């Protein structure tokens, strides 16, 4: 079975449990914390996937690392991944879980690329306008500054990209000019 299929199964089980206990939002935040730890500390997954480290030591490491910051549900999920030797699916599982929970809450994530930082008011306006475009009740906006855009915005929501950047407009114009001179 592929890592993604394994990740989806664990994500679905976690989603059902969190929804049943009415702690979906809390578990999403906890899983984001775990993902941040994994992304900023590569040794974390290296230790948990190392074949010479015993399962007991891995369990103790997870419990000591997260006992104060994770709910029993989230902690148990991590321990289950370790016990079943599926920890390599952790990041994919977190991503799948977030997708499922956002879908259930009629939400989506949007990454907004801009040449300069956006104010919270601008981000809120983008959230309202684009939530309607993608038929969602709420849009969670993350602003990423990319000076190469020169101006305008590039917005990624799921697999959709809305590109209104000056750079893309100049690139389009350049292609049209080159095509016209042939």
From Swiss-Prot:
| First-listed, main subcellular location of the protein, grouped into a coarse class | membrane
Q: Does the keyword Ribonucleoprotein apply?
A: no
What InterPro entries does the database record attribute to this sequence?
ATP_synth_OSCP/delta_N_sf, ATPase_OSCP/d_CS, ATPase_OSCP/dsu
- Fetch the Gene3D superfamilies from UniProt: N-terminal domain of the delta subunit of the F1F0-ATP synthase
The entry's keywords: ATP synthesis, Cell membrane, CF(1), Hydrogen ion transport, Ion transport, Membrane, Transport
A GO molecular function annotation here is: proton-transporting ATP synthase activity, rotational mechanism
Superkingdom of origin: Bacteria
* Gene Ontology CC annotation, any one: plasma membrane
**Role summary:** F(1)F(0) ATP synthase produces ATP from ADP in the presence of a proton or sodium gradient. F-type ATPases consist of two structural domains, F(1) containing the extramembraneous catalytic core and F(0) containing the membrane proton channel, linked together by a central stalk and a peripheral stalk. During catalysis, ATP synthesis in the catalytic domain of F(1) is coupled via a rotary mechanism of the central stalk subunits to proton translocation. This protein is part of the stalk that links CF(0) to CF(1). It either transmits conformational changes from CF(0) to CF(1) or is implicated in proton conduction.
PANTHER family, per the entry: ATP SYNTHASE DELTA CHAIN
Q: Which family does it belong to?
A: Belongs to the ATPase delta chain family.
UniProt subunit comment: F-type ATPases have 2 components, F(1) - the catalytic core - and F(0) - the membrane proton channel. F(1) has five subunits: alpha(3), beta(3), gamma(1), delta(1), epsilon(1). F(0) has three main subunits: a(1), b(2) and c(10-14). The alpha and beta chains form an alternating ring which encloses part of the gamma chain. F(1) is attached to F(0) by a central stalk formed by the gamma and epsilon chains, while a peripheral stalk is formed by the delta and b chains.
Provide the protein name: ATP synthase subunit delta
Q: Which organism is it from?
A: Alkalihalophilus pseudofirmus (strain ATCC BAA-2126 / JCM 17055 / OF4)
